[in-house]
């Protein structure tokens, strides 16, 4: 497995997979209550470790090898239980570290600032000061009311995307690339430059006990990431998705659909998903809904009843809802003649396409 560094949440799915390694998931039944419960608890333990340990490695010493070790995973597996955790459990203990307990501080005292407030503040700070020399009229679109009015009308009618973008590419030589670019709607633009400001600093923490606490020159631990999987030493699968804290959850579920239930790639992507929101959001003010699971509609039946009996609060969503990610994936297979075959899948939860030539 390959993923982004600890300045992202890329390790989260790998840690959860490690915690699940000794569980025969296939025998539990796909998307059964027992399966959803076990995968959810593995994810919640991994998210606790994400928030406890992961951050920009230029500023924080991250115990990567320990977090991915079998010994550490064995200790984390001992936390599995029959009923829902409720609040996010604490991170695991590693000698020499004092990890941040995100579950104990969800929401905390950290305050969010609205996008509109941020834009107003930034525009005020970035607006050029008018001097006699700078007051010379120039064409910037604002001097043409009719053009400006038409632009405003067009923007009012535009459906603005609310999510990260994703792109997965494999060429004829088998080279694999996945990119997950992301800035949110209404990213502030510096007047006169055409350049938008990044706004991922909302994924920093203000709590000084967090490894992801804001600092000059430091990268926030961001949610966008991708996963690449090799099989028998050769590239096999590459995939990513938008979705914030759902990203690791969606990628893990798709991979388990392939590995534990032997689904075809598009089937694995289409299959109903679930989402824990016990995890404090990566976005300020880092709110959480302890013990709450979101389920796509097809899971809202016997599975939901059994999960409720385990102590989960459940929220139903329509099938193929974009709150559950939008995975793009490519698998490299070899046919009987040794020719490389590329199998691509696009998630119906967003405007996602798969194409080849």
Question: What is the role of each PLM region?
Answer:
Residues 1-46, 190, 196, 227:
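Catalytic phosphate/nucleotide-handling subdomain of diverse soluble enzymes
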Residues 1-6, 28-31, 155-156, 238-242, ...:
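Second-shell loop/turn segments in exported
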Residues 301-357:
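In a subset of proteins, long, contiguous C-terminal domains/tails are tracked
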Residues 47, 173, 218, 251, ...:
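Extended C-terminal subregions enriched in glycine
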Residues 139-160, 165-237, 247-248, 253, ...:
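Active-site rim segments in enzyme catalytic domains, especially the processed small/beta chain
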Residues 1-5, 12-16, 25, 167-169, ...:
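Short, well-ordered beta-strand elements
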